[in-house]
């Protein structure tokens, strides 16, 4: 019994260390991308808005809709019941 408890504790410790290291890596990557972004805010916002307008309503690769059609009672579920 004590061996399995130690094994569980070791696994939990490894999971915590892995999540901590991945979190710090993601923060580092986010910091690098924000430093590389252009300083012109309006130009970058205009560049982002163009691809958003060209999106289709449904992506055939995923069963979840991009825009919820509100076919069920939960208006923000994101899953279309009609597909």
Curated annotation (Swiss-Prot):
Induction: Regulated in response to changes in circulating iron concentrations, iron stores or the development of inflammation and iron-restricted erythropoiesis. Down-regulated following anemia induced by hemorrhage or hemolysis: down-regulation is mediated by ERFE. The induction of upon inflammation is mediated by IL6. One of its GO terms (molecular function) is copper ion binding. Keywords: Cleavage on pair of basic residues, Disulfide bond, Hormone, Secreted, Signal. It is found in: Secreted. Pfam families: Hepcidin (PF06446). Highly expressed in the liver and to a much lesser extent in the heart. Secreted in blood. GO terms for biological process: cell surface receptor signaling pathway via JAK-STAT; defense response to bacterium; defense response to fungus; establishment of localization in cell; inflammatory response; intracellular iron ion homeostasis; iron ion transmembrane transport; macrophage activation. InterPro entries: Hepcidin. Disulfide bonds join 65-81, 68-71, 69-77, 72-80. Residues 24-53 form a propeptide. GO terms for cellular component: extracellular region; extracellular space; nucleus. Residues 1-23 form the signal peptide. Belongs to the hepcidin family. Liver-produced hormone that constitutes the main circulating regulator of iron absorption and distribution across tissues. Acts by promoting endocytosis and degradation of SLC40A1, leading to the retention of iron in iron-exporting cells and decreased flow of iron into plasma. Controls the major flows of iron into plasma: absorption of dietary iron in the intestine, recycling of iron by macrophages, which phagocytose old erythrocytes and other cells, and mobilization of stored iron from hepatocytes. Interacts with SLC40A1; this interaction promotes SLC40A1 rapid ubiquitination. This is Hepcidin. It comes from Mus musculus.
């Amino acid at each position: 019994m004590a061996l399995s408890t130690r094994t569980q504790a070791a696994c939990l410790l490894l999971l915590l260390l892995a999540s901590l290291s991945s979190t710090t890596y993601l923060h580092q990557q986010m910091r690098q991308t924000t430093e590389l972004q252009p300083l012109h805010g309006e130009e970058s916002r205009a560049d982002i808005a163009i691809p958003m307008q060209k999106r289709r309503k449904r992506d055939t690769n995923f069963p979840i809709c991009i825009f919820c059609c509100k076919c069920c009672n939960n208006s923000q579920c994101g899953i279309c019941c009609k597909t």
